[in-house]
């Protein structure tokens, strides 16, 4: 596409630092969005504005402009290289649909194209983009028209055990975006969801426990005073293997029963967690072996039959700062798992 002189001028101006440009000129050139200057980086193909402080890809910015029925920006972003077909993800009026059609948009997207664009847009793991995705997609009728099984599969990949059996797609998608924000510690997005979805405070606590996010766990429990039954917290921490950070926080910082954490880990067949609990001081080995046999987990029972496990004295049990805990356990290898592994290599477990 050959750009007009005016479009080129806007492109150059949008690439300047806002402090170098007077607001009046930016407004005249249509480079004022969300009550502030808009910046465009043509190399990264990203747009910045007061609500997109991390920047979003120009195709995502187009989706937002279409949702807002901002005709000038729809034209401008298309001239700057945005794919006009992305507009069909959020078009909500006939007038906007006509404009997008004039700019070259298809009549409609196929199911595979909707899912493809959905996956492309959500790849940018920043607060700005995740908030945009939530606002555009969580209550979007276009997602009601596509294959539910495929979409729920995408959501399940993120939520796993935290995915509830509900037919309300908007609720699942809200948790989906919230979960991404928590997993990747997107502070601004987390704050955004926290302020708007009070009923999800405990769900966020479960998510932090399940996904080993000790910083968010500390934020919720120590600062925000969000509470739930301690045994339930242990179950969520032990449900996913190698959740060393949240198991440590629950047992060492909050005082949960380390033997109970070991029992939960056995029930979930999470051997890494089980050995970590022994490293921390769990000593109900015989009870754990009995539980493993009751639950038909014979391999774990065999592991617990080795009478040579002990607490890891080199592991500090005094840390309470989540950042210190993260550093301490970043590359942690379980002492007792190593013992079991060496025993297995030398003797096997057939004769236990």
Swiss-Prot record:
> Quick check: keyword Nucleotide-binding in the entry?
no
Inducers of expression:
Expressed in the early phase of the viral replicative cycle.
Instruction: Give the CC-aspect GO terms.
Output: host cell cytoplasm
Keywords, A to Z, come to: Early protein, Host cytoplasm, Host-virus interaction, Inhibition of host innate immune response by virus, Inhibition of host interferon signaling pathway by virus, Inhibition of host STAT1 by virus, Inhibition of host STAT2 by virus, Interferon antiviral system evasion, Viral immunoevasion
Q: Which GO terms describe its biological process?
A: symbiont-mediated suppression of host innate immune response; symbiont-mediated suppression of host JAK-STAT cascade via inhibition of STAT1 activity; symbiont-mediated suppression of host JAK-STAT cascade via inhibition of STAT2 activity; symbiont-mediated suppression of host type I interferon-mediated signaling pathway; taxis
Q: How does it assemble?
A: Interacts with host STAT1; this interaction mediates STAT1 degradation through apoptosis. Interacts with host STAT2; this interaction mediates STAT2 degradation through the proteasome.
Q: What does this protein do?
A: Plays a role in virus cell tropism, and may be required for efficient virus replication in macrophages.
Protein name listed in UniProt: Protein MGF 360-9L
Question: Origin organism of this chain?
Answer: African swine fever virus (isolate Warthog/Namibia/Wart80/1980) (ASFV)
């Amino acid at each position: 596409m050959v750009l007009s002189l005016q479009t080129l001028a806007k492109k150059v101006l949008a690439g300047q630092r806002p402090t170098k440009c007077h607001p009046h000129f930016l407004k005249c050139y249509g480079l004022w969005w969300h009550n502030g200057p808009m910046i465009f980086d043509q190399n990264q193909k990203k747009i910045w504005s007061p609500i997109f402080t991390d920047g979003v890809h120009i195709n995502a910015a187009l989706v937002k402009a279409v949702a807002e029925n901002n005709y000038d920006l729809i034209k401008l972003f298309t001239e700057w290289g945005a794919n006009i077909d992305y507009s069909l993800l959020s078009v909500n009026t006939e007038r906007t649909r006509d404009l997008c059609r004039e700019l070259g948009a298809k009549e409609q997207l196929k199911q595979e194209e909707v899912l493809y664009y959905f996956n492309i847009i959500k790849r940018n793991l920043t607060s700005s983009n995740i908030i945009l995705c939530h606002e555009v997609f969580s209550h979007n009728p276009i997602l009601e028209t596509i294959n539910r099984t495929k979409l729920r599969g995408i959501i399940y990949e993120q939520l796993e055990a935290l995915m509830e059996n509900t037919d309300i797609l908007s609720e699942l998608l809200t948790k989906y975006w919230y979960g991404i924000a928590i997993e990747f510690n997107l502070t601004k997005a987390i704050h955004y969801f926290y302020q708007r979805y009070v009923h999800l405070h405990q769900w966020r606590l479960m998510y932090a426990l399940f996904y080993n996010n000790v910083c968010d766990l500390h934020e919720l429990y120590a600062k925000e005073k969000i509470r739930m039954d301690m045994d339930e917290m242990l179950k969520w921490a032990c449900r996913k293997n190698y959740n060393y950070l949240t198991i440590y926080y629950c047992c060492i910082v909050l005082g949960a029963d380390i033997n109970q954490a070991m029992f939960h880990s056995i029930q979930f067949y999470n051997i890494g967690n089980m050995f970590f609990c022994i490293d921390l001081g769990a000593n109900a080995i015989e009870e754990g072996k009995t539980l493993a046999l009751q639950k038909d987990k014979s391999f774990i029972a065999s592991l617990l039959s080795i009478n040579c496990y002990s607490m890891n004295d080199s592991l500090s049990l005094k840390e309470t700062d989540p950042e210190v805990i993260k550093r301490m356990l970043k590359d942690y290898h379980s002492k007792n798992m190593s013992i079991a592994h060496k025993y297995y290599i030398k003797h096997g477990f057939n004769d236990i």
